[in-house]
Amino acid sequence: MSSKEQKTPEGQAPEEIIMDQHEEIEAVEPEASAEQVDPRDEKVANLEAQLAEAQTRERDGILRVKAEMENLRRRTELDIEKAHKFALEKFINELLPVIDSLDRALEVADKANPDMSAMVEGIELTLKSMLDVVRKFGVEVIAETNVPLDPNVHQAIAMVESDDVAPGNVLGIMQKGYTLNGRTIRAAMVTVAKAKA
């Protein structure tokens, strides 16, 4: 046989065989390079993961700080609102004994005596004016009778048997109570009805 007449599988020409073998070699080379990972690529991937983690921590930190600032702002607003709302509490507490004295003066005044009528009227007007002024600032009087005893606004002094008032209800007021913008600043001292034995 001549050198040109070599046996080829399935009638392929020698150039085709060389090309096929060359393609197989090229196909094998990428597999070999895939096994050899460039250390720089691994380092880049590691750094990217660290960067993503740091960004997530930073975002979480920023959100946490924003939430804390918002909570602080709300608390401050509430504190300021309460300070405005209840700033008068100390002043009102100092004023309550004066109001009580005017109430007691009216209770003991001889209203049937014509000589005392001008004084009684003056005390009534003074008390009314004073109560009108404190009401403008959110003060309300607790002086209702025949209502259920409420420990938030009533202080029970005694229990008295009664047919007219249901047991557990306020029978009488010994000393009026007061609230400032819904908060009790002095509980009303009351007698409470109980069933007859």
UniProtKB/Swiss-Prot annotation:
Site features described as Interaction with DnaK, chain residue numbers: 183
Outcome after substituting residue 122 to D: Temperature-sensitive phenotype
Induction summary: By the sigma(32) subunit of RNA polymerase.
GO cellular component: cytoplasm; cytosol; protein-containing complex
Mutagenesis or variant effect for residue 151 to A: No effect in ability to interact with DnaK
GO process annotations (BP): chaperone cofactor-dependent protein refolding; protein unfolding; protein-containing complex assembly; response to heat
UniProt-reported outcome of changing residue 186 to A: No effect in ability to interact with DnaK
PROSITE patterns attached to this UniProt entry: GRPE
Region (Disordered), start-end ranges: 1-40
UniProt main location, coarse: cytoplasm
PANTHER family: GRPE PROTEIN, GRPE PROTEIN HOMOLOG, MITOCHONDRIAL
HAMAP family for this protein: GrpE
Sequence similarity: Belongs to the GrpE family.
Complex formation: Homodimer.
The protein, known as: Protein GrpE
Species per Swiss-Prot/TrEMBL record: Escherichia coli (strain K12)
